[in-house]
Amino acid sequence: MKVSVLITLAVLGVMFLLTSAEERGSDQMDSPAWLKSMEIIFQSEERECRWLFGGCEKDSDCCEHLGCRRAKPSWCGWDFTVGKWEMLINMNIFRIVFSYSMCTV
């Protein structure tokens, strides 16, 4: 009985030492310098775009689902789309309404 308790305590001690060593190694991964370097990597991959109500000169200046509103001063506004499927649905609805309005005239 005493031997099994000693073996259990020895195993727990070894496990404690291993986990504390892993935690010390992870401190380097969580450091602000490491996070800033990763932030620079991700920013370099992204295209700079202007958010809602940001200034713009053309539609490509604005982020996805935003278009450049030409009212002075020009600003990025929502273009009433959510995704590719939303745009296709809106185009089909426009076609249906337009064809219906042409038939009733």
Curated annotation (Swiss-Prot):
Positions of post-translational Valine amide modification: 82
Intrachain disulfide bonds: 49-63, 56-68, 62-76
An example Gene Ontology molecular-function term: toxin activity
Propeptide: 22-48, 83-105
Record has Amino-acid biosynthesis as a keyword: no
Transmembrane segments: none
GO CC, alphabetical: extracellular region
Superkingdom assignment: Eukaryota
Pfam family for this entry, one: Toxin_12
Main location: secreted
Signal peptide (UniProt feature, chain positions): 1-21
The protein's role, per its UniProt record: Probable ion channel inhibitor.
Entry domain remark: The presence of a 'disulfide through disulfide knot' structurally defines this protein as a knottin.
Name this protein carries in UniProt: U21-theraphotoxin-Cg1a 4
The organism of origin for this protein: Chilobrachys guangxiensis
Lineage: Eukaryota, Metazoa, Ecdysozoa, Arthropoda, Chelicerata
